[in-house]
Each structure stands twice: as structure tokens, then as C-alpha cells.
Amino acid sequence: IAAGAPEDCIQWLDLKSMYATTALMKHPGVATILATGGNAMVAAAYSCGKPALGVGAGNVPAYVEKTCVLPRAVNDIVLSKSFDNGMICASEQAAIVDTEIYDAFMKEIKRFKVYFVNKEEKAKLETFMFGAVAYSDNVNAAKLNPNVVGKPATWIAEQAGFKVPEDTQIICAECKEVGPNEPLTREKLSPVLAVLKAKNTDDGILKATQMVEFNGLGHSAAIHTEDHEISKKFGHACKAIRIIENAPSTFGGIGSVYNAFIPSLTLGCGSYGHNSVSNNVSAVNLINIKRIGRRNNN
């Protein structure tokens, strides 16, 4: 406004409810909708009869391939996952590490104020965060507890019923597989990271594709490698719009810092994620562009 924008260019609802959101989207004064949120909200935006740009959820894997520069890869993952307490939708939800460098990875990441839960603590963490323990009878009903979103690792641990050092940045949990049986391989929007071992390159890529297809279609996937051919194979296999190579996925996904992606916190997932856009949404998507077609005998 101080720079000359219209006085009412930014408005908001004090009343937080689906009814209020629906009423706003259907208001005759609204021309276009940019919807960022859960699948239900995005679907509602698309069905309200107006032009809508909806973006989807992410479930981002970081494949740590054996040829990577390991100290850099670990630093990138910690830097990315700890930023804003893991709230960015492009942040890593699981590190998938080749078996040849798994022990070295574990040793390196523990230098960064990262806490690995034991079996009992993992069950407590799953119960608090998702209401279900891995491989339990009700595991398919697991649903993220919204109270954990953006909370510090120390708070999450305390609420789950165990203690971590006061300077803990990230809570890590070793998981056996990707999918409903392991709730911590879901999107967590918090400084909690699943860690899985890959038997070989094909297994690492398979687990990464499973992560993306486990409620994160079209969003993002990261790989740390010095093998360009493996990077290409990974990119072709993952149904993700953004393939982030050798960079923190949070900052790689939202663009500008580590690559040439358009800077944005609104990340389209394309047809993979049932979105109308597949790019990083910016002002270009929200303006009308007039064109004059002057006669030219081509």
C-alpha cells in the first residue's frame, strides 16, 4: 500500500471455516481462485464454476545415491528439513540411502543435532502424529495430527511422550518400507524425517517413486548423486514436476536460490496431482495479458 497499491488489495477472513471459504470462492466479486491446501479444498475450488489454480500436496523423497558428495548431501537435507520446522511442502519427508553408504550417512547426520528414535519412541511418535502404529490393525486409518504442523522437534517429542536434547533440530525414524504400513513415510509438515535403506539403485529409485505416489503425485523429488545417468533415470521414473538435483529440496523446490525455478511457495503438480498448473505459480499466472495481432502475411 505504501508503494501505491490499492487500499483493499489484500483482504482476509477472520472467520475460519469451510462455509466461509466456500462463500468467498462463490462471491460474485471474486474472478479467479488460487487454492493452496488439502485435496478437498482444491477440489472445491475447481468445482465452484470460476477459473481456479489449485496446487497439491507433496511427499518428497531425497534419494542419497552412493556416488554423492555425502557431507554436502547430509548438510542439504538437514538445512532443508529444519527450515521453518519442516512446514514447506517441498521439504524432504524421507531420506532413502544406498546400503553402501548407509552407515556413513548415519554417522554424518548425527553430527547435526538430529535425534534417532528407538523402537518404543517410534511407536509413541506414530501414535501422536498419526494415531496409528506401524503395521497395526488400524494403520490404514492413519491421519496427520494438525497440531504437529510447524512445531519444534522438542515439542513434538514431549507431546509424544519421550525426551530429546533441547537443541534437537530434527527427529529421525528408520522405516522398513514406503506406504500405509509406515505412517512416518507420509507427509508430515514438521521436523520429522523417515530414513530408509536402499538395496541398490533400482530399489532407491523405486522407493522414491513410491514416496511421490503416496499422496504426493506431481510435486517434487530430490536426488543427491554425481552420476548424471542415474539422475536422468530418477527424473524419468518419478511422477514429480520438480526434480531437485544436489540441493536442499525446500529451497530447490521454491526456486531461485539453488536453481532457475521461479520463486514461489505455491507449487503446481500438473495433471499428476490433478492440478491445472505444473509450474511454480507466480504473478504471471494471475494477470491478464492482452495481445494485438497485426496483419502480417506469413
What is the meaning of each model-derived region?
Residues 24-28, 69, 131-144, 184-186, ...:
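Short, surface-exposed amphipathic charged segments that create phosphate/polyanion-binding patches used
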Residues 15, 19, 28, 36, ...:
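Conserved active-site and cofactor/substrate-binding residues in soluble primary-metabolism enzymes
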Residues 27, 55-57, 87-91, 186-191, ...:
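Short glycine-enriched loop/turn motifs at secondary-structure junctions
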Residues 10, 33-34, 58, 98, ...:
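Buried hydrophobic positions in well-ordered alpha/beta secondary-structure cores of metabolic enzymes
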Residues 42-179:
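ALDH superfamily catalytic-core signature
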Residues 9-14, 34-37, 52-55, 97, ...:
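General beta-strand structural signal in soluble alpha/beta enzymes
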Residues 1-72:
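Rossmann-like NAD(P) dinucleotide-binding subdomain of oxidoreductase/dehydrogenase enzymes
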Residues 162-298:
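Conserved C-terminal structural/oligomerization subdomain of aldehyde/semialdehyde dehydrogenase
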